[in-house]
């Protein structure tokens, strides 16, 4: 599938009608997918959604039962991985334990019998780019997890790949290291401009790093777009729910931070400019107030249905409301994403063929 607005003359990767089955399990269900040149595209989805199978199909590690893969206009569907011009980084990178960081990064260049001076200059530059200049003489077991993944990326980039494929490269690292590496990866991409496809199940990682996000589910692409597009204008309930916490207000999905909380119905409908907005207001009971740095999570129960839901408000608003367990409050959705059930934002490539509102958790 190709999202509207993508110029087909500037496409690095095209996957067309890819179908892959393992026994009774359909991993890819006639997927169409394109990656613009120089972009960083994230494949996001739950386990079993097909994201890793799609990446491995691009890499040549898996063969589609039907369909084609082209890289910069060259059909590589039956071309082995080592001849596709790709760099690949796995979650658990297999470094050469007996080689130093420098020699690990240089390995691919030595195999290609590049001149020694070229290898030295290339490795020096890459170690500087990935922030490992001071670690070039160390061995992999002397590096922290984040440093090993930086080494892995430098090694993948050393051979000047046309495409860089990353299969959950930070998935085995702790949360703080992952957060730091996300910012680093974005800076690295902006510097080297290699067309990159990143597989992740981490919504924050995809939203933070990617130029475009493809959300997969059950072997299909549900939506492709910029982080802003998929978050603010999700195609369907699955995309919205997968990209963050949701509650249901008046039968529509809303984000917790789009729920206004007030002590009175009037406070719940008051707009920022002081005017009143006519919309449904729901009464709820406060179950718990959890401080999360700048924001505060308010866990609530609908007075109408007894269903639990969550609102996310600023710390300042929470202090002004002075919420406590058991308090009665009034809530209202300030924004509702325009979800259209069954709609799609990825048209296929041409081929044949006034009452009290009720709230529940989603």
Swiss-Prot record:
<feature type="domain" description="ABC transporter">
    <location>
        <begin position="13"/>
        <end position="243"/>
    </location>
</feature>
<dbReference type="GO" id="GO:0043190">
    <property type="term" value="C:ATP-binding cassette (ABC) transporter complex"/>
</dbReference>
<keyword id="KW-0813">Transport</keyword>
<comment type="subunit">
    <text>The complex is composed of two ATP-binding proteins (CysA), two transmembrane proteins (CysT and CysW) and a solute-binding protein (CysP).</text>
</comment>
<dbReference type="GO" id="GO:0005524">
    <property type="term" value="F:ATP binding"/>
</dbReference>
<dbReference type="GO" id="GO:0016887">
    <property type="term" value="F:ATP hydrolysis activity"/>
</dbReference>
<feature type="binding site">
    <location>
        <begin position="45"/>
        <end position="52"/>
    </location>
    <ligand>
        <name>ATP</name>
    </ligand>
</feature>
<keyword id="KW-1278">Translocase</keyword>
<dbReference type="InterPro" id="IPR008995">
    <property type="entry name" value="Mo/tungstate-bd_C_term_dom"/>
</dbReference>
<protein>
    <recommendedName>
        <fullName>Sulfate/thiosulfate import ATP-binding protein CysA</fullName>
        <ecNumber>7.3.2.3</ecNumber>
    </recommendedName>
</protein>
<keyword id="KW-0472">Membrane</keyword>
<dbReference type="InterPro" id="IPR024765">
    <property type="entry name" value="TOBE-like"/>
</dbReference>
<dbReference type="InterPro" id="IPR050093">
    <property type="entry name" value="ABC_SmlMolc_Importer"/>
</dbReference>
<dbReference type="Pfam" id="PF12857">
    <property type="entry name" value="TOBE_3"/>
</dbReference>
<keyword id="KW-0764">Sulfate transport</keyword>
<keyword id="KW-0067">ATP-binding</keyword>
<dbReference type="InterPro" id="IPR003593">
    <property type="entry name" value="AAA+_ATPase"/>
</dbReference>
<dbReference type="GO" id="GO:0015419">
    <property type="term" value="F:ABC-type sulfate transporter activity"/>
</dbReference>
<comment type="function">
    <text>Part of the ABC transporter complex CysAWTP involved in sulfate/thiosulfate import. Responsible for energy coupling to the transport system.</text>
</comment>
<dbReference type="InterPro" id="IPR005666">
    <property type="entry name" value="Sulph_transpt1"/>
</dbReference>
<keyword id="KW-1003">Cell membrane</keyword>
<comment type="similarity">
    <text>Belongs to the ABC transporter superfamily. Sulfate/tungstate importer (TC 3.A.1.6) family.</text>
</comment>
<dbReference type="Pfam" id="PF00005">
    <property type="entry name" value="ABC_tran"/>
</dbReference>
<keyword id="KW-0547">Nucleotide-binding</keyword>
<dbReference type="InterPro" id="IPR003439">
    <property type="entry name" value="ABC_transporter-like_ATP-bd"/>
</dbReference>
<dbReference type="InterPro" id="IPR027417">
    <property type="entry name" value="P-loop_NTPase"/>
</dbReference>
<dbReference type="GO" id="GO:0102025">
    <property type="term" value="F:ABC-type thiosulfate transporter activity"/>
</dbReference>
<dbReference type="InterPro" id="IPR017871">
    <property type="entry name" value="ABC_transporter-like_CS"/>
</dbReference>
């Amino acid at each position: 599938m190709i999202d509207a607005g993508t110029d087909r003359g500037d496409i690095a990767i095209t996957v067309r009608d890819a179908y892959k089955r393992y026994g009774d399990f359909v991993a890819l269900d006639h997927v169409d997918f394109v990656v613009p040149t120089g972009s960083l595209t994230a494949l996001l989805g739950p386990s079993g959604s097909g994201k890793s199978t799609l990446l491995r199909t691009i890499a040549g590690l898996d063969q589609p039962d039907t369909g084609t893969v082209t890289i910069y206009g060259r059909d590589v569907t039956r071309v082995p991985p080592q001849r596709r011009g790709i760099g690949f980084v796995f979650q658990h990178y297999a470094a050469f334990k007996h080689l130093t960081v420098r020699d690990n990064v240089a390995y691919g260049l030595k195999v290609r019998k590049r001149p020694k001076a070229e290898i030295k200059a290339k490795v020096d530059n890459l170690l500087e780019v990935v922030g490992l200049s001071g670690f070039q003489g160390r061995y992999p077991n002397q590096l922290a997890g984040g440093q090993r993944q930086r080494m892995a990326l430098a090694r993948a980039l050393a051979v000047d790949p046309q495409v860089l494929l990353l299969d959950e490269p930070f998935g085995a690292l702790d949360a703080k290291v992952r957060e730091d590496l996300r910012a680093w990866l974005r800076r690295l991409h902006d510097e080297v401009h290699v067309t990159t496809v990143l597989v992740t199940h981490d919504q924050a990682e995809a939203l933070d790093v990617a130029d475009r996000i493809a959300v997969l589910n059950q072997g299909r692409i549900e939506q492709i777009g910029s982080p802003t597009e998929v978050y603010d204008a999700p195609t369907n309930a699955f995309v919205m729910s997968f990209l963050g916490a949701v509650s249901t207000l008046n039968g529509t999905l809303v984000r917790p931070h789009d729920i206004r909380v007030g002590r009175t119905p009037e406070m719940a409908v008051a707009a920022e400019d002081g005017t009143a907005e006519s919309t449904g207001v729901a009464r709820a009971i406060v179950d718990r107030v959890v401080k999360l740095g700048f924001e505060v999570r308010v866990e609530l129960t609908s007075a109408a249905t007894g269903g639990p839901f969550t609102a996310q408000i600023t710390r300042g608003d929470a202090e002004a409301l002075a919420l406590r367990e058991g308090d009665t409050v009034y809530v209202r959705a300030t924004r509702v994403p325009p979800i259209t059930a069954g709609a799609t934002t990825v048209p296929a490539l041409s081929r044949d063929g006034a009452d009290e509102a009720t709230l529940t958790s989603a």
